[in-house]
């Protein structure tokens, strides 16, 4: 499977580290946010915008929950999952948009329609699909994929100049991912992640 990088935007695959990550105040804010009711409101806001993007009927919902900052050192990825199958994932570690609303809707649209690796989600599938937001630290070198706790940390592979991102929501078989990384002679990195469902 091939993953693309364009304008610092990365298509991703979900997974979930070897040594503990140092404390990251920005990621810690998101970790605390993920446990509050506002996190659910954020996912509902994303669902409203997904419905609007899919039907052409604009979502007028305003992003009510005050989210922690998205900019600086954090990556942002949105994954769409239907049943146990990923239907799209899109995001980046560096962002062109500065406003949270614009950034999140852009990455949501990317996950819905710009990730050509997956069959697009149909409107009747939306209500039973999961929309997953992953907030990520910067990748750091990792010894091997087997040493990464893929339930909590993501994997970033650099293979012949191509970036592949695996967020904790997607990867089901780390061993298969490790074989692929060895076969392609990839540099392996890991990143800390907060997942909001």
Predicted regions and their residues:
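Bacterial Sec-dependent signal peptides at the C-terminal "C-region" and cleavage site
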Residues: 4, 9-23
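Basic nucleic-acid-binding interfaces
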Residues: 19-197
């Amino acid at each position: 499977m091939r993953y693309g990088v364009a304008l610092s935007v990365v298509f991703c695959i979900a997974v979930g580290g070897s040594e503990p990550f140092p404390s990251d105040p920005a990621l810690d804010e998101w970790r605390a946010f993920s446990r509050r009711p506002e996190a659910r409101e954020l996912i509902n806001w994303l669902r409203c915008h997904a419905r609007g993007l899919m039907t052409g009927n604009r979502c007028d919902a305003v992003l009510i929950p005050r989210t922690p900052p998205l900019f600086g050192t954090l990556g942002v990825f949105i994954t769409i999952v239907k049943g146990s199958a990923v239907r799209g994932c899109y995001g980046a570690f560096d962002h062109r948009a500065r406003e949270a609303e614009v950034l999140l809707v852009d990455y949501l649209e990317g996950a819905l329609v710009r990730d050509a690796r997956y069959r697009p989600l149909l409107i009747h599938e939306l209500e039973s699909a999961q929309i997953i937001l992953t907030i990520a630290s910067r990748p750091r070198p990792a010894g091997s994929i087997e040493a990464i706790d893929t339930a909590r940390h993501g994997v970033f592979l650099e293979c012949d100049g191509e970036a592949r991102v695996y967020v904790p929501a997607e990867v089901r078989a780390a061993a298969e991912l490790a074989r692929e990384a060895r076969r392609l002679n990839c540099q392996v990195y890991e990143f800390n992640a907060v997942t909001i469902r």
